[in-house]
């Protein structure tokens, strides 16, 4: 006990502190906290909290821990961590709140090297400081069946202390690197303040109607059984629809349907192939229905209820702040960003994400944000005009591309224009367009040529951004986010062409990601500032989902539209569509 007080007193005299909090798993919100290391003023301390072996030290009482450390963790002195969000989750389980200022060296490193997946502290320290840290003594055990809780305190302390001690110097080095790379404003104004926002969202979670999921599971299972019966009838015998080998035998040997695409392992039975074969025989269509139901049932309907936290009846995802090289957030355990929405069946899954009694879900979604960013970058007069006057941009594109009046545009022409508008920024080729629209490549090339003839500004920008990427070896977003492009000059044509497509879509997708992150900051601050009974729960691509008291829905809706539309100053206005309801499906 005296040792804890002495450590807290010594750290209180240090100008800045390094902090590492260690758990026994990969889920900071729920795993067992093994211990924490603190370092400052040339001294490092390790506090064992969850070691479980014969002779292990007793866990410190929570009240004692809070009394000694909360003044430090909640004070004005910088407390640096490698992944502050994970550290804050684990500290909260000990009754501690990390609100002190400080850097997140993991996040800083990810901004500097966005294409690298992992940024372990040992590698970042070696790269930025030339300093070797001791290896994790439990790494081998954690890959097997063991864990950190069984490791002896001395071994963990010898590793944990240097990890905490390196953080102040590492934070300084990374801050200098961010300045040199012109990334400091993005880190300081967007990424670092977003950490506590995401922390709050992960803690909040979203309510799920497990009874509705259970009913859906039974219904989907019965529908799959009926489809299996019809498949058996169509084939003339039972077969395993999930086996590509058995399915291929039925399709191509027994039914003698044409082989459309060949793989090394045999004829393909992918979605594209089955859709074409369904025009000739009912069995492929039944397979598609069965696959769709199996995917929905296995991935969502049956899996999601198992992830509901029994303590609050809610699902808590984990957001990766730098989950993609473009800067987009990603969601894991579970991934709530890919909950399907296109079909009526998949919308029923969203209907199981609900608000508690007396509350509503409010969804706010940017309208065509990537197209608006393309208009901003390209300064194409036709695109700019479409967004400034608020006309249907796909109808305008169809009219321009096919040379007809807007009132004469057919649904098929608008569909082609929509594919063009969303595909051009991703390097859509004539072959790709022909595949999507089931037309000859020559006809598709003609459509693309007519598009670029009418939208010359877009073509010029596409060419200029690739040229700039080749010259600078990098591309940036409107907010300055960096993505290195080393393969833009590769000799291998496939690598080079892929890099050229990335050079085009990164400024657009990355700027959209930045806009959404700024919007999250603005919405979070505004909700707190106006003291509304509401909290942000999810970010899904260009959409924010907020849970609000019924009486606050109108104010929250207006706040979302106001703050989100003001999150960036582009050459065209940002527009946000807002809805609300008892479920996510009703709200969006």
Give residue spans per PLM region.
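Conserved "right-hand" nucleotidyltransferase catalytic core of DNA-directed polymerases
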Residues: 1-55, 79, 116, 145-344, ...
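Short, basic/hydrophobic alpha-helical segments
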Residues: 6, 10, 58-76
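Short active-site loop/helix that positions an aromatic residue
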Residues: 27, 36, 85-96, 106-113, ...
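Short alpha-helix plus adjacent loop in nuclease-associated cores
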Residues: 46-63, 102-165
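Acidic beta-strand-to-loop metal/phosphate-binding motif
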Residues: 72, 76-84, 361-363
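Conserved catalytic core of nucleic-acid polymerases
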Residues: 200-203, 309-312, 316-317, 321-324, ...
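C-terminal polymerase-core module
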Residues: 222-229, 233-285, 453-501, 505, ...
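Short beta-strand-to-loop capping motifs
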Residues: 546-550
